[in-house]
Amino acid sequence: MTTEIKKLDPDTAIDIAYDIFLEMAGENLDPAYILLFNLQFEERGGVEFVETADDWEEEIGVLIDPEEYAEVWVGLVNKQDEMDDVFAKFLISHREEDREFHVIWKK
């Protein structure tokens, strides 16, 4: 018997990712990136819910089912409203009782 996973709605996934970003950015991003993000966030900042990529295994070393995770990017958008400077990519489990997450930080 398989259990149906209640997926995170985009707004909830975005809130979770942004909270984690604010909490962990200081430990994981270069100070220059933090300064750039803070200076430009009001004008160009974005947090986007995107289609879950299927290449996370290459990044985190664990095979995942894209249907069981939400992917959210935090970064800066350009004039075409496209995120062209990604500071963190989040992979967040849809399972509320086991809300694991993975983050790829800008290097």
Swiss-Prot record:
List the Pfam families.
DUF440 (PF04269)
Disulfide bonding pattern of the chain: none
| InterPro entries the record matches | dsDNA_mimic_put, Put_dsDNA_mimic_sf
Can you tell me which family this protein belongs to? Belongs to the putative dsDNA mimic protein family.
Q: What does this protein do?
A: May act as a double-stranded DNA (dsDNA) mimic. Probably regulates the activity of a dsDNA-binding protein.
* NCBIfam families for the chain: PRK05094.1
Q: What is this protein called?
A: Putative double-stranded DNA mimic protein NTHI1680
Organism whose genome encodes this protein: Haemophilus influenzae (strain 86-028NP)
